[in-house]
Amino acid sequence: MRGLSASSVVAPWRERWINWRNRLVADPRFQRAAAASPLTRFVARRRARALFDLCAGFVYTQILLACVRLRLFEALASGPAQPSQLAARLDLTPEATHRLLRAAASLNLLRALPDDRYALDDLGASVLANPSVAAFVEHHALLYDDLRDPVALLRGETRTRLSQFWPYAEGRADDPEACAAYSDLMARSQQLIAEDVLDAYPFGEHQSLLDIGGGEGAFVAAVAMRHPELRLQLLDLPPVAQRARDRLATQGLARVDVRAGSFLDPQPAASADLVTLIRVLHDHDDAMARAALRAAHEALTPGGVLLVAEPMADTPGAEAIGEAYFGFYLLAMGSGRARRRAELTLLLQEAGFAGVRHLPSLRPMFASVLIGRRV
């Protein structure tokens, strides 16, 4: 054993243990014994349920889609109802209504009451409270089509619908019609995380904010409500910038300086002491992400702060969101990837930011927050 590091000794042992365990778990006799034993029955059933949920996940999402499209949650917003009352409103037969209600209740979207009425349960109420969730449920119809043949997607053999939906993934960033749909979707989803980001960092310590890739202005509008003293700027592509001007004007926020352009263009030097990139970097491959960070560095005053908020691949307890969901969503989109915190930290450091650190946020599965200072 002389000359071997501790890690080189541990690794083979760990691999032998994993191989032995996998052979055991894959043995049908062990599976039956584990399911029958009072000592292991709970674990065996839980894992069997987890495996079945993986197989049935598409069915569950389609049940949610049916609830959204039929506006079932809105129908129950004022209180519980009988299936017979709902059938006419949903334009379904009584049998189909019962089937949907029971299915939704099994997924904790609805709650079945003892008198055969149904009410919203926690998940259904959450969808109702966050219109952006329903918008994404509808939007996922594109993703499901792209995932019809996941092997072809992995091999790059298909032209995906998502890449057509996101115009900058196909080089159509100046097409106003193409930008309209995705800009509206992003504006809705920004509302879900804006308050979390504002709670995570003291924006009031700054004089001027530039939101790069700010879309239609949902985030800067939330900042304006919380910090009316901040001078606000937004940068996005020309068709999106015009939509931002119109949207912000209707909210009484014409004071926001909306700039039409790209982060690939030279930025006005020292134009803000706080720059934000809210769910921007993960949409782009490394070369474009570095360009966005260079633009942020150019725009910041010396010592100014860059704030990055986006889903990260290694968020504790939400690994499947970063690695599985965003991993395949961005593959279908044709651009970007969810990065681990260490990867983003390195990108920020390479772009000239020091003291990069993570800030706690309420729902890090949707947006984890990193900050760094320009040096």
Say what each PLM segment does.
Residues 2-28:
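Eukaryotic partner-binding/assembly regions in large regulatory complexes
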Residues 130-317, 365-368:
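Conserved adenosyl
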Residues 110, 118, 232, 256-258, ...:
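Generic structural signal for residues in well-ordered beta-strands
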